[in-house]
Swiss-Prot record:
It comes from Escherichia fergusonii (strain ATCC 35469 / DSM 13698 / CCUG 18766 / IAM 14443 / JCM 21226 / LMG 7866 / NBRC 102419 / NCTC 12128 / CDC 0568-73). The keyword GTP-binding applies. Belongs to the RapZ-like family. RapZ subfamily. This is RNase adapter protein RapZ. Keywords: ATP-binding, GTP-binding, Nucleotide-binding, RNA-binding. The lineage of its organism: Bacteria, Pseudomonadati, Pseudomonadota, Gammaproteobacteria, Enterobacterales. The keyword GTP-binding applies. Pfam families: PapZ_C (PF22740), RapZ-like_N (PF03668).
């Protein structure tokens, strides 16, 4: 059974995540004190029910040791996973302005901007040990819920999930990435007028890139690097490995290479997911 701990900065989508988990059959509790986690888990273990609990600045333990002790006291039947939701500062400010809600730390006479920064510092101990960090800056409510359903329901228990995501550097580096590879030095299909409207998912773009030796070398060396360290990552009790591939716009080279890497590791029996940030953004 899974004990999903949902944390993150206020305004990043924790309530949406908790509702999505409830729809998936999790027993959900909002803002349960950390010290009560073992008691809740023992009660649900008897009923064989997975649980999801949100933790934010309102119920953060006074020290990281309290959280670690609570995790140690969980029943063996439960596999704890920590999901941390985040968004960039400007997005959080906009969301609070749109909803006109009060930030949890604003009561301490802090401005909204200062409250967001203070909260980030307070939550860093949880963020640093998260199994999965999700950047919701570019996501709608429905996209976040669907992404969680895909990643969590499609995940085999206790097995590392490899996530390959393409992005464009002009849109910023994904904050949920464990590894970032820059492919802007590779031949660019953008300069071919016939290929420019296409994406790395289209066969003509794939054929263009496939003709270049340096593209093959990059894919080979990148997958070799990941294969070298993957056994250690798998034994490090982590649930996700997110590999971000970036080109200028996130439309051609990064998409193609992310798909090539995803296909390779999928063919080796790994649990693999792929995501294309720029292409998903264009659909909205």
């Amino acid at each position: 059974m899974v004990l999903m701990i949902v944390s993150g900065r206020s305004g990043s989508g924790k309530s949406v995540a908790l509702r999505a988990l409830e729809d998936m059959g999790f027993y959900c509790v909002d803002n349960l004190p950390v010290v009560l986690l073992p008691d809740l888990a023992r009660t649900l273990a008897e009923r064989e029910i997975s649980a999801a609990v949100s933790i934010d600045v309102r119920n953060m333990p006074e020290s990281p040791e309290i959280f670690e002790q609570a995790m140690t006291n969980l029943p063996e039947a439960f596999s704890p996973q920590l999901l941390f939701l985040d968004a960039d500062r400007n997005t959080l400010i906009r969301r609070y302005s749109d909803t006109r809600r009060l930030h949890p730390l604003s009561s301490k006479n802090l401005s909204l901007e200062s409250a967001i920064d203070k909260e980030s510092d307070l939550l860093e101990p949880l963020r640093s040990r998260a199994d999965l960090i999700v950047d919701t800056s570019e996501m709608s409510v429905h996209e976040l819920a669907e992404m969680l359903r895909t990643r969590l329901l499609g995940k085999r228990e206790r097995e590392l999930t490899m996530v390959f995501e393409s992005f464009g550097f002009k849109h910023g580096i994904p904050i949920d990435a464990d590894y970032v590879f820059d492919v802007r030095f590779l031949p660019n299909p953008h300069w071919d007028p016939k290929l420019r409207p296409m994406t790395g998912l289209d066969k003509p773009v794939a054929a263009f890139l496939d003709r270049h030796t340096e593209v093959h070398n990059f894919i080979y060396q990148t997958r070799s690097y990941l294969e070298l360290w993957l056994p250690m990552l798998e034994t490090n009790n982590r649930s996700y490995l997110t590999v971000a591939i970036g080109c200028t716009g996130g439309k051609h080279r990064s998409v193609y290479i992310a798909e090539q890497l995803a296909d390779y590791f999928r063919s080796r029996g790994k649990n693999v997911q792929s995501r294309h940030r720029t292409l998903e953004k264009r659909k909205t």
